[in-house]
Design a protein with these regions (language model features):
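Outer-membrane beta-barrel translocator domains and adjoining extracellular loop/strand segments
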Residues: 19-26, 48-52, 74-79, 113-119, ...
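Residues that define the transmembrane beta-barrel architecture of outer-membrane proteins
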Residues: 27-33, 58, 80-86, 129-133, ...
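Transmembrane beta-strands of outer-membrane beta-barrel pores
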Residues: 13-19, 39-41, 66-72, 106-110, ...
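Glycine- and aromatic-enriched membrane insertion/assembly motifs of diderm outer-membrane
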Residues: 80-132, 136-140
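Repeated loop/turn-to-beta-strand initiation elements of outer-membrane beta-barrel proteins
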Residues: 3-7, 43-46, 96-100, 145-149, ...
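Residues on the lipid-exposed face of transmembrane beta-strands in outer-membrane beta-barrel proteins
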Residues: 1, 11, 35-39, 86-92, ...
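Residue-level detector of the transmembrane beta-barrel scaffold of outer-membrane proteins
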Residues: 6-10, 36, 61-65, 99-103, ...
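Outer-membrane beta-barrel "beta-signal"
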Residues: 29-48, 193-211
Length: 211
């Protein structure tokens, strides 16, 4: 605004959790917006900071992940159920810092009969009927060999009706070698976590960057 005064704004989306592996492990989601002023005591004029765009890229990857996790189905069922997913990812890079993804999920949620409210379910549910299939799209933010990603999918098949027709997954991936990628992610149902999964992926680069 003036030689010594400036205005700044910020926003944040936070999730706070007690970090428990067993229920209750509910978290709190908060949205924070802020605005303030700063006074700069130095007499020199504030330097102008030039913004730089990340180098453009147009390479393509296929990444296949096999993930495994365990979780408690609900607050009143203290059993721990195995879960996992086979995820096929198609990534197209926009720059050295970002990429888009699309693909298909094959999900096994061991606690599904007890996490979802199905009064008609009585007795044992076969493992095959605890499987789900879906398609998804997502966004990746790349920091060297590590990336943070958010994906939103829609169910195409399920024997047990999930609580919502769409599901989010968010997590972190790290490139271990040129072809192997580690995965840590949360499979959720809107703002409710269903299970945390760890996995290993294989990367197939089929188009090199030409920019």
């Amino acid at each position: 605004l003036l030689d010594h005064w400036s205005v700044y704004m910020f926003g944040a989306l936070n999730h706070m959790s007690n970090g428990a592996l067993k229920k209750p492990n509910n978290g709190i989601n908060t949205v924070t917006l802020g605005m303030g002023t700063r006074y700069h005591f130095r007499s020199e004029k504030l330097p102008d900071v030039d913004t730089r765009e990340a180098p453009a890229r147009n390479n393509r990857d296929i990444q296949i992940f096999l993930n495994y996790g365990r979780s408690q189905a609900n607050d009143f069922n203290f059993n721990i159920y195995s879960s996992g997913s086979l995820s096929l990812n198609y990534l197209w890079y926009r720059s050295a810092k970002s990429a888009w993804s699309a693909g298909a999920d094959f999900i096994y949620f061991g606690g599904a009969p007890y996490a979802y409210d199905h009064p008609e379910v009585d007795g044992y549910v076969p493992h095959l009927k605890r499987t789900f299939a879906g398609v998804f799209g997502g966004r990746h933010w790349i920091m060297g060999n590590t990336s943070f990603f958010v994906q939103v999918g829609a169910y195409l098949y399920s024997y047990l009706d999930p609580q919502q027709p769409v599901y989010p997954r968010l997590g972190i991936r790290h490139r271990i070698t040129d072809r192997l990628v580690g995965n840590f992610s949360v499979k959720a149902s809107f703002f409710r976590s269903e299970f945390i999964e760890l996995g290993l992926g294989y990367r197939i680069p089929y188009k090199k960057n030409s920019l």
